[in-house]
């Protein structure tokens, strides 16, 4: 499996209407692009650990999209719903980091040893 990880920070002045439009486009993309296998979203939670100070600049939100393979991710990236989401994303966010990862299978330790 391939994970597409997006860390992002919304504009501090984003309007409620713009935020709703962004979320609607996000929902449309994840429900209409057939290669998306799983999606998780999160909001940063601070617990006072020392490592938190090392993560600057911090990102408030993340989105994690899962695909069967690289071809599935590439199909997602090229899909019209993702292209539309991407254009809207840049008008709603001030910064982002995006990474793609190969996920370990059921025997994660064995997979990690092979890396």
Please report, for each region that a protein language model flagged, where it lies by residue.
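Non-catalytic surface loops within mature trypsin-like serine protease
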Residues: 10-12, 43, 67-69, 105
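Core segments of cupin and vicinal oxygen chelate
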Residues: 19-21
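Active-site-flanking beta-strand signature of metal-NTP-handling nucleotidyl enzymes
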Residues: 2-10, 62
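Short, flexible turn/loop "capping" segments at secondary-structure junctions
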Residues: 1-2, 55-57
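An amphipathic, aromatic/His-enriched active-site/gating alpha helix that lines ligand/cofactor pockets
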Residues: 14, 25, 31-36, 56-60, ...
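Glycine-rich beta-strand-turn "strand-cap" elements at beta-sheet edges
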Residues: 41-55, 87-115
């Amino acid at each position: 499996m391939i994970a597409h990880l997006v860390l992002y920070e919304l504009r501090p002045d984003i309007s409620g209407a713009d935020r709703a439009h962004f979320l609607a486009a996000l929902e449309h993309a994840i429900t209409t692009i057939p290669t998306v296998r799983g999606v998780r979203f999160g909001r940063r939670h601070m617990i006072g650990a020392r490592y938190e100070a090392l993560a600057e600049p911090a990102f408030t939100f993340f989105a994690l999209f899962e695909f069967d393979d690289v071809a599935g991710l590439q199909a997602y990236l090229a899909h019209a719903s993702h292209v539309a989401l991407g254009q809207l994303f840049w008008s709603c966010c001030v910064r982002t980091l995006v990474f793609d990862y190969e996920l370990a299978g059921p025997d994660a330790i064995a997979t990690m040893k092979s890396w």
